[in-house]
Design a protein with these regions (language model features):
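Accessory, solvent-exposed terminal regions and/or long lumenal/extracellular loops of proteins
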Residues: 119-122
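Surface-exposed amphipathic alpha-helical segments
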Residues: 124-164
Length: 164
């Protein structure tokens, strides 16, 4: 049976992008997830080719962007993270919950809840997974490529986060 992301979580929209520069191909998968607890490792196990046994994500933090996880699997290097509706990007459910507890107690969220349109906490996320093959580059160079692409991607989508 498929792994649940959280009790009420659902992937509303999923998109796949591929970018080519010289001999390097960058693949990006983005899913708009509702009702999530923000556990990226759990989402990776439940929704991607990493179902088999993804191992542990190595966590990293970029100032002004937030957290992301890096994982090498077979001949690819992956970067995965959740763009939050407010607050920096997160990888673990603890980071996601911290953002919700510190960012969502606002008048507009309270009004949203009082009108019966949802929870005070905004449990949505733009779950992004990027990857590059390791045949054309080494893991250190691949990590730099992924992190540079991630910063641009994050800045673009953070400002365009969908309305609830």
């Amino acid at each position: 049976s498929p792994l649940k992301i959280g009790d009420t979580s659902q992937v509303k929209v999923a998109r796949k992008y591929r970018y080519q520069k010289h001999s390097l191909s960058l693949e990006v998968e983005m899913r708009y997830v509702l009702g999530t607890n923000g556990d990226v490792e759990g989402m990776m196990k439940g929704h991607t080719i990493l179902k088999s046994s993804p191992g542990k994500l190595a966590l990293a933090n970029i100032q002004g962007v937030g957290f992301h996880g890096i994982l090498q699997q077979q001949n690819r290097l992956y970067l995965s993270s959740c763009i939050n509706p407010s607050g920096g990007a997160t990888v673990t459910s603890e980071q996601f919950r911290y953002n919700r507890n510190t960012q969502d107690v606002r008048f507009d969220r309270l009004l949203f809840w009082l009108l019966g349109k949802g929870n005070i906490q905004d449990q949505r996320c733009l779950w992004t997974q990027m990857s590059v093959p390791l045949n054309a580059t080494n893991p250190e160079a691949a990590k730099k490529i992924l992190e540079n692409a991630w910063v641009s991607w994050y800045r673009r989508w953070e400002s365009q986060f969908p309305e609830p």
